[in-house]
């Protein structure tokens, strides 16, 4: 049985890849960033990638899909920004509601940052839930941690899953994996030691924990950094910064803290090594930093399919 999905704000394909692994076939993926669109086409030439503003996309012709998914922009709700919420012009939740009305999917899955669960956005969350309820969906909000699903990174993300009433009772959130994910040291040791860098073993010991959260930052400074400014970080000492530069040339006697390459950051985000990224280094790092870890999308996607099959 084939399950179809339409994805908005597809980015570099983290969510799309996870949903594909779960069993969804994408009828279309809408993304406004040219380099991210090229990344999608590079990895899946057969995907119907539509480059453009989702606000100009019309859902007619895609009615009857099984899933409407997307990672709508996070700046309106991110603590790194002004948290303007619904007053931010980048808020695309209204577009997701519009497309749900136009395409009438059986299920909806939208992803955003943890900040959306802040008390200041409670009324807006209720508004979103109510708007989908008017279309015949019962929605749930849930905070998930990527580390619970095999990713070597905490990365808390908010998921909104809504299903048509006939499927609602069959949906259950995915259970965390029983095994702990690899530490960053274990995950990246082969890449760190591939040039016979003598400090690789010591680096592995220092990196013997999972990562906090990879964050996309503005160009010309750092593009990815460890988000250790959170008051709950307890002053962890291993603050690493990834700068926009070439792939690190680690001399055998190098003793400093090496920068993380594009491939390393992608692996931390849960992408497979054969997933390629298009563009210069700044766009590539940004694509990775903004991505939804594929293993998390896969875990939720599998549960949605079970609900659509009425298996749970």
From Swiss-Prot:
TM segment ranges: none
The entry's keywords: DNA-binding, Methyltransferase, Restriction system, S-adenosyl-L-methionine, Transferase
Disulfide pairings: none
SAM-dependent MTase C5-type domain ranges (all copies): 3-311
Matches recorded under PROSITE patterns: C5_MTASE_1 (PS00094), C5_MTASE_2 (PS00095), SAM_MT_C5 (PS51679)
EC numbers for this chain: 2.1.1.37
Record: active site: 74
GO-annotated biological processes: DNA restriction-modification system; methylation; negative regulation of gene expression via chromosomal CpG island methylation
Pfam families given in the database record: DNA_methylase (PF00145)
GO molecular function: DNA (cytosine-5-)-methyltransferase activity; DNA binding
Classification via InterPro entries: C5-Methyltransferase, C5_DNA_meth_AS, C5_MeTfrase, C5_meth_CS, SAM-dependent_MTases_sf
Reaction catalyzed: a 2'-deoxycytidine in DNA + S-adenosyl-L-methionine = a 5-methyl-2'-deoxycytidine in DNA + S-adenosyl-L-homocysteine + H(+)
Family the UniProt entry places it in: Belongs to the class I-like SAM-binding methyltransferase superfamily. C5-methyltransferase family.
PANTHER family named in the record: CYTOSINE-SPECIFIC METHYLTRANSFERASE, DNA (CYTOSINE-5)-METHYLTRANSFERASE 1
This protein's name: Type II methyltransferase M.NgoMIV
Recorded name of the encoding gene: ngoMIVM
């Amino acid at each position: 049985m084939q399950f179809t999905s339409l994805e908005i704000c597809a980015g570099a394909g983290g969510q799309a890849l996870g949903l594909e692994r779960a069993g969804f076939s994408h009828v279309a993926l809408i993304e406004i960033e040219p380099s991210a669109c090229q990344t999608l086409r590079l990895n899946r030439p057969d995907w119907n990638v539509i480059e453009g503003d989702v606000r100009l996309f019309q859902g007619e012709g895609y009615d009857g899909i099984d899933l409407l998914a997307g990672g709508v922009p996070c700046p309106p709700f991110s603590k790194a920004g002004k948290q303007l919420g619904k007053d931010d012009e980048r808020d695309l939740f209204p577009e997701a509601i519009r497309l749900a009305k136009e395409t009438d999917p059986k299920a909806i899955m939208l992803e955003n940052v943890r900040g959306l669960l802040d008390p200041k956005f409670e009324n807006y969350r209720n508004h979103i839930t109510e708007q989908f309820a008017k279309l015949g969906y019962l929605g749930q909000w849930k905070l998930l941690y990527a580390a619970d699903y095999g990713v070597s990174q905490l990365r808390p993300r908010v998921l909104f899953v809504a299903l048509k009433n006939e499927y609602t009772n069959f949906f259950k959130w995915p259970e965390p994996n029983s095994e702990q994910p690899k530490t960053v040291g274990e995950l990246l040791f082969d890449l760190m030691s591939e040039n016979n860098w003598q400090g690789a073993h010591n680096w592995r010991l220092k990196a013997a924990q999972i990562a906090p959260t990879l964050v996309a930052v503005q160009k010309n400074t750092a593009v990815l950094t460890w988000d250790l400014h959170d008051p709950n970080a307890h002053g962890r000492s291993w603050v690493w910064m990834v700068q926009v530069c070439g792939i690190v040339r680690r001399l055998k006697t190098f003793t400093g803290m090496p920068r993380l390459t594009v491939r390393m950051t992608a692996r931390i985000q849960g992408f497979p090594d054969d997933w390629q990224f298009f563009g210069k280094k700044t766009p590539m790092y940004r694509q990775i930093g903004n991505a939804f870890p594929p293993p998390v999308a896969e875990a939720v996607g599998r549960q949605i399919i079970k609900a659509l099959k009425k298996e749970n």
